[in-house]
């Protein structure tokens, strides 16, 4: 099984909007890297290619689920502005959906976010409020909360870090997709954590299918990391949806190690992903190296095109 996908490739009809294409992303078998890193040939490594979502990241799933939930509960009504804090990808997803559905969007974003992310937000028509780099995503969270508290009638505030609709998007979407795409053969699930929605929802669903599946949570290895979108939970504002008891294994990824794997994925597997995807594959490889047989599945949250201005691509190593 080289590539598995349940995305429909039929002819789109006029009423098929952009949000209808969210989810059902391909599951790619990682080529070459497992052999290079000494993984037993009886161990299979796969990754969900989340840049196939319309705005280019896994966050399309949670953004759509939170917006649909807000509409059902009467929290998002005509004329309201969608407001949230983001390291970039959720903001881009909210901006895309807002543009498609006629809502204004404001995103509080750390000033360290890549220029590509800021530009994408602007192209979708979002108003970007930059927050201090020293506070990382925590500063963006505090600013979004302050703005909402000042004028709650003006905003729909999904609050992705504390909204159960975030992880439910993966419980009802990503988890079942992985189970179907692997024919239930998955033995290990590996995911990085930021809001923790992808990890929490997917892990809970996979455990429901098979309690013996090992779930691996990946955080940055220290507070002063360079992995956009990921949280070092011991030193950050912990999301309300984060479940510290869910992981069977918890791993800390170093920034340089994750960046090295990000480069290696491009050079040896033809996969251009972002640094958080590099962290996920770094952890997946480390898990796979300990196994005699099995199937390890991870999630690549976004593509590498929104990080092309980052200097880590220029490293002269020879992974």
Where are these regions (language model features)?
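PLP-dependent amino-acid enzyme catalytic core
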Residues: 1-319
């Amino acid at each position: 099984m080289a590539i598995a996908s349940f995305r429909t490739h039929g002819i789109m009809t006029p009423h098929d909007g952009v949000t209808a294409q969210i989810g059902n992303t391909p599951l790619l078998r990682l080529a070459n890297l497992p052999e290079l890193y000494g993984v037993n040939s009886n161990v299979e490594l796969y990754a969900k290619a989340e840049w196939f979502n319309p705005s280019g990241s896994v966050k399309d799933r949670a953004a759509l689920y939170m917006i649909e939930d807000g509409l059902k509960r009467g929290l998002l009504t005509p004329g309201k502005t969608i407001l949230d804090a983001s390291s970039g990808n959720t903001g881009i997803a909210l901006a895309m959906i807002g543009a498609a559905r006629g809502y204004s969007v404001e995103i509080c974003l750390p000033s360290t976010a890549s220029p590509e992310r800021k530009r994408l937000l602007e192209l979708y028509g979002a108003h970007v409020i930059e927050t201090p780099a020293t506070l990382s995503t925590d500063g963006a969270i505090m600013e979004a909360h302050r703005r909402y508290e000042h004028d709650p009638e003006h905003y729909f505030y999904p609050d992705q870090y504390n909204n159960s609709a975030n992880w439910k998007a993966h419980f009802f979407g990503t988890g079942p997709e992985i189970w179907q795409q692997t024919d239930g053969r998955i033995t290990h699930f590996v995911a990085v954590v930021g809001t923790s929605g992808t990890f929490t929802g997917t892990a809970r669903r996979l455990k429901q299918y098979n309690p013996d599946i090992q779930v691996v949570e990946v955080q940055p290895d220290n507070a002063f990391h360079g992995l956009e979108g990921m949280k070092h939970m011991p030193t950050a504002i912990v999301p309300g949806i984060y479940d510290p008891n869910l992981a069977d294994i918890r791993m800390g990824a170093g920034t340089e190690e994750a960046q090295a794997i990000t480069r290696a994925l491009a050079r040896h597997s033809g996969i251009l992903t972002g640094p958080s995807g590099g962290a996920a594959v770094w952890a997946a490889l480390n898990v796979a190296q300990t196994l005699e047989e099995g199937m390890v599945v991870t999630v690549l949250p976004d593509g590498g095109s929104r990080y092309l201005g980052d200097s880590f691509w220029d490293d002269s190593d020879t992974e």
